[in-house]
């Protein structure tokens, strides 16, 4: 209290007591006691002199003015009183005004001199102080009453042995006290006061209570009676609070043992039973299991030996019935950095308050922000912990607001005051205390609280190293408990007798006290071990039984539909991303810059004479297509790799809301797919423009977009499976390099390791690579559907097939037939084996051959399988193969002639064939899909002749309806007996893989596998 206000208050006290007969000795003694309480000893005389001067205490009785003069003085004093009160009114808080009014009433009541003039001045004070009439009457009756029967107010509570003479509206509790302890609640300011009407010796926070004197009953206060009984602040205010009385809530936790994955015991023998309206702290040294205990009680961890029940419902078995009952605020920052204070709270509210309209949600959000003192910061981005635009205390309050917006019945908080200033810490705990007074049950882990904060808790749970509980009860009583347990001299004193402060550090100094060696130096050995403390705890503390409610707990959660959840998640994430300017800039420029760099490097004067750039002769086009796919994979992976890791902490909190995991994933995928669509389009637009790839923009974009979407889902999988962004980014090269190796470009599929390779077809291991499907689709589509080639593709296919059969297959079959003629009677087993292979090859090729002119009429099965081959048949086959070769030469020539005629027709109609070919056709790509660079045009593999040349012109040869496998670069694929374009078939495959990995993401298969592997590793170490 400032000097100016204290002088004004002194004048006010003097004016009141000078009325109607002047100052009595009792009144003056009351003022002296007040000054001694508020001032240093040296200043008491100065203020007492001021009081005596104004009150006229030193005047003789004969010097008093007559009655008429007294009345005039009274009027003057009333005006002066009004002026003083207005002056005080501008400085004191409402709580301080209530205390001043009580002191004034105590002063008047000290001599029972209730005159009209004094009463009028006191009424003036209460009016100027804006104290409601009901509360003034309550305070006046409380301060002046000698009989409890006159205190007929609902804000009065009587503690005594027998409820005799109780007024109808009063509350009553039983207490072993002679006389009556009278408690008063001033609801408007949330303050409690106590008077003792009796002759016994009771102590309040260690001070002897003078009978009839009014005392502030503040947070953490304890009244002790002569018989050793105690009345705690937390228990008494619960009797005042109607919300606590009407809330049906019970929380019972019985945790016999909890082990971590590595087998270490984290929690032992914990039993907690609580009802509504409690603020309960959990303290302990580092590694004592505070956060573990909190997580078990919140349901984040499951104890193998123990249960946690809310209103009789198991938190793990009855999740649906307990939906929305629990709230959790972790020690970590759970804010979305890119959103504003308002947006963080608004989108959270939309996810849990679906029953409210948009206007109602907006109103509630603004109200919560105002209550937390954040309304002036609502439009600021919260930023990161390091790059922050709001203070640490404001961040903590906003984190708590995420749960307060829906007001769960039970709230768990992990060190909500860590890293905060003492003022911010008090604000946070004040907020939680107010919430507990509304009937909520709150548990929080706290570290090194101040005295004021420590006394705000209703109960304190103390944990010791190894997960042992060693105390469970009133916070202030904990100090005396541990002092008595260690036989300290001042064991009866729990707080400072002068200021009332408590020192929580004292508790840990006692708990962790070390044994001193013979040199007076502390050793590492503790005087009392955790087990010994726990044994004392078990013998002295029993969880007070509470009524186990059977009703479904009060629900404050209203979840929107899954579709609406998806929309809210998407809106929130989209807003966060567009608000992050560096993120947006990098992701928007990444693709066009890479395309520009890549296309610029590989564009050169490719004309045969080196004079200009011609697309047809650019040998880098196949490599560009491969790099386009790798870039699409890279962008898709990098943009999604941190998405779930970044949200991991937020997801942990939102797990209590039972929101749809699928809705969350769909929101992520929607935004990532949109971003991938933009990135791949800008890449293709820039790359195709520079390299003059014409007519392929949308076809290439669809492939790259599909590839990038696949990478998005893969990135989300690894983001879900691992907890470290570093791990994820280390994995990206491990994912991309196999995609390059097995793309079919760097290494020939026919020349891979024999364990992997399947000659003539793409290996199964390569079929797992998206790059293989994407690259094949792009190259085949570019060759088959470019503006130049698409008119001739059908003819060239027939031409290529005829050329292969006449030039390569006929010759190979002829050689096989000659070999059989030369070895009609095999000399040894090795020759016999070669003979059988040749027969097998001839049989397989001839049984499906459409050209049969000159083919022996004998049954092919009889000839080649059942040893029916003779010299006569061999000679007939020799003549047949000659005819076979000539037949396909004719087909080849006919199709070549058709192509020439078609070209001639186009040229005759004004088309520049050469220009068209230069613009749309690429020689290197053509050589790639035709495989003209290979020396082997046909090869034998496992009794089959495999065509190596011209895979683009081959037709699929499925062995069964589901047989999709075919040579690389084939133009068409088999799908359930139907022939489908390779481009669309490969698109379908990539989207199928994407869907498969989405299911893996939804069910978290990879995360579970990583978890199993981690557990297996831990078991090996053990």
Task: Give residue spans per PLM region.
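Small-residue-enriched hydrophobic alpha-helices in membranes
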Residues: 1-187
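Topological signature of polytopic alpha-helical transporters
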Residues: 163-200, 204-205, 217-219, 226, ...
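Helix-to-loop junction immediately C-terminal to a conserved catalytic motif
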Residues: 298
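ABC ATPase NBD Q-loop/coupling interface
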Residues: 307-321
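Q-loop/switch helix immediately C-terminal to the Walker
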Residues: 337-354, 364
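ABC ATPase C-loop
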Residues: 403-404
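Catalytic Walker B motif of ABC-type/P-loop ATPase nucleotide-binding domains
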Residues: 411-415
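Alpha-helical transmembrane segments and their short interhelical loops
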Residues: 438-445, 450-454, 459, 663, ...
């Amino acid at each position: 209290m400032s000097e100016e206000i204290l002088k004004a208050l002194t004048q006010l006290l003097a004016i009141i007591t000078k009325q109607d007969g002047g100052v009595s000795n009792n009144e003056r003694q009351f003022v002296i006691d007040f000054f001694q309480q508020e001032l240093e000893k040296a200043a008491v005389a100065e203020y007492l002199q001021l009081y005596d001067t104004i009150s006229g205490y030193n005047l003789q009785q004969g010097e008093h003015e007559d009655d008429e003069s007294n009345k005039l003085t009274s009027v003057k004093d009333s005006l002066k009183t009004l002026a003083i009160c207005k002056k005080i009114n501008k400085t004191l808080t409402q709580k301080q005004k209530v205390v001043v009014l009580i002191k004034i009433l105590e002063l008047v009541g000290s001599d029972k001199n209730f005159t009209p003039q004094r009463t009028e001045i006191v009424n003036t004070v209460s009016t100027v102080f804006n104290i409601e009439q009901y509360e003034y009457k309550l305070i006046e009756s409380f301060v002046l009453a000698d009989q409890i029967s006159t205190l007929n107010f609902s804000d009065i509570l009587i503690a005594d042995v027998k409820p005799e003479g109780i007024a109808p509206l009063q509350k009553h509790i039983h207490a072993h006290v002679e006389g009556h302890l009278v408690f008063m609640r001033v609801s408007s300011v949330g303050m409690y006061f106590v008077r003792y009407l009796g002759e016994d010796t009771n102590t309040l926070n260690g001070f002897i209570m003078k009978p009839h004197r009014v005392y502030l009953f503040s947070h953490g206060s304890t009244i002790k009676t002569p018989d050793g009984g105690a009345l705690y602040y937390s228990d008494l205010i619960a009797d005042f609070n109607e919300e606590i009385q009407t809330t049906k809530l019970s929380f019972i936790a019985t945790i016999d043992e909890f082990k971590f994955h590595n087998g270490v015991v984290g929690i032992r023998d914990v039993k907690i039973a609580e009802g509504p309206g409690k603020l309960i702290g959990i303290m302990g040294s580092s590694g004592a299991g505070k956060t573990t205990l909190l997580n078990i009680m919140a349901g984040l961890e499951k104890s193998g030996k123990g249960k946690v029940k809310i209103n009789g419902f198991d938190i793990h078995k009855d999740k649906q019935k307990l939906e929305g009952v629990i709230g959790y605020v972790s020690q970590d920052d759970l804010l979305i950095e890119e959103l504003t204070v308002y947006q963080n709270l608004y989108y959270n509210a939309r996810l849990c308050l679906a029953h409210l309209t948009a206007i109602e949600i907006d109103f509630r959000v603004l109200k919560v922000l105002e209550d937390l003192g954040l309304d002036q910061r609502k439009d600021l981005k919260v930023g990161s912990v390091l790059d922050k635009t709001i203070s640490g205390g404001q961040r903590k309050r906003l984190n708590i607001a995420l749960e307060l917006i829906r007001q769960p019945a039970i709230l768990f908080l992990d060190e909500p005051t860590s890293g905060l200033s003492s003022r911010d810490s008090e604000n946070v705990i004040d907020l939680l205390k107010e919430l507990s007074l509304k009937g909520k049950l709150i548990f929080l882990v706290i570290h090194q609280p101040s005295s004021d904060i420590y006394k705000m808790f209703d109960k304190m749970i103390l944990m010791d190293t190894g997960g042992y509980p060693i105390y469970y009860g009133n916070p202030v009583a904990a100090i005396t408990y541990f002092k008595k347990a260690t036989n300290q001299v001042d064991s009866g004193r729990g707080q400072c007798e002068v200021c009332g402060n408590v020192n929580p550090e004292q508790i840990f100094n006692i708990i962790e006290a070390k044994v001193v060696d013979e040199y007076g130096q502390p050793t590492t050995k503790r005087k009392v071990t955790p087990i010994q403390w726990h044994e004392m705890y078990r013998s002295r503390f029993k969880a007070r039984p509470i009524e186990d409610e059977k009703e479904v707990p009060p629900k404050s959660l209203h979840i929107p539909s899954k579709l609406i959840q998806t929309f809210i998640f998407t809106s929130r994430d989209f807003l966060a991303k567009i608000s992050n300017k560096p993120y947006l800039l990098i992701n928007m420029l990444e693709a066009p810059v890479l395309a520009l760099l890549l296309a610029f490097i590989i564009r050169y004067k490719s004309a045969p004479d080196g004079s200009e750039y011609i697309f047809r002769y650019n040998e880098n086009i196949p490599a560009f297509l491969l790099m386009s796919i790798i870039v699409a994979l890279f962008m898709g992976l990098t943009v999604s790799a941190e998405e779930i890791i970044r949200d991991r902490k937020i997801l942990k909190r939102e797990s209590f809301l039972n929101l749809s995991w699928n809705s969350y994933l769909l929101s992520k995928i929607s935004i990532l797919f949109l971003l991938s669509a933009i990135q791949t389009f800008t890449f293709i637009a820039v790359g195709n423009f520079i390299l003059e790839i014409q007519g392929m923009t949308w076809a290439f974009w669809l492939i790259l977009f599909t590839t990038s979407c696949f990478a998005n889902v893969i990135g989300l999988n690894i983001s879900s499976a691992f907890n470290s962004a570093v791990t994820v980014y280390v994995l990206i090269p491990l994912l991309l390099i196999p995609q390059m190796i097995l793309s079919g470009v760097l290494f020939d599929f026919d020349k891979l390791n024999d364990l992997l390779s399947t000659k003539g077809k793409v290996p199964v291991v390569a079929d797992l690579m998206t790059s293989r499907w994407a690259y094949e689709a792009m190259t085949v589509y570019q060759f088959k559907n470019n503006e130049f080639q698409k008119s001739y593709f059908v003819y060239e296919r027939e031409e290529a097939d005829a050329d292969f059969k006449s030039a390569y297959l006929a010759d190979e079959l002829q050689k096989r037939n000659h070999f059989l003629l030369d070895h009609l009677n095999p000399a040894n087993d090795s020759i016999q084996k070669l003979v059988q292979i040749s027969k097998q090859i001839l049989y397989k090729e001839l049984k499906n051959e459409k050209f049969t002119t000159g083919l022996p009429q004998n049954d092919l099965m009889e000839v080649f399988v059942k040893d029916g081959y003779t010299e006569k048949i061999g000679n007939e086959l020799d003549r047949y193969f000659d005819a076979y070769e000539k037949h396909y030469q004719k087909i080849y020539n006919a199709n070549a002639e058709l192509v020439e005629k078609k070209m001639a027709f186009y040229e005759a109609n004004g088309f520049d064939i050469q220009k068209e070919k230069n613009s749309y056709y690429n020689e290197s790509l053509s050589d790639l899909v035709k495989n003209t660079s290979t020396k082997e045009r046909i090869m034998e593999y496992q009794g089959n002749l495999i065509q190596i040349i011209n895979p683009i012109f081959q037709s699929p040869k499925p062995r069964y309806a589901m047989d999709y496998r075919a040579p690389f670069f084939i133009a068409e694929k088999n799908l359930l007996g139907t022939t489908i374009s390779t481009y669309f078939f490969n698109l379908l495959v990539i989207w199928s893989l994407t869907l498969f990995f989405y299911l893996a993401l939804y069910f978290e298969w990879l995360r579970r596998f990583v978890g199993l592997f981690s557990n297996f590793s831990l078991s090996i170490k053990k």
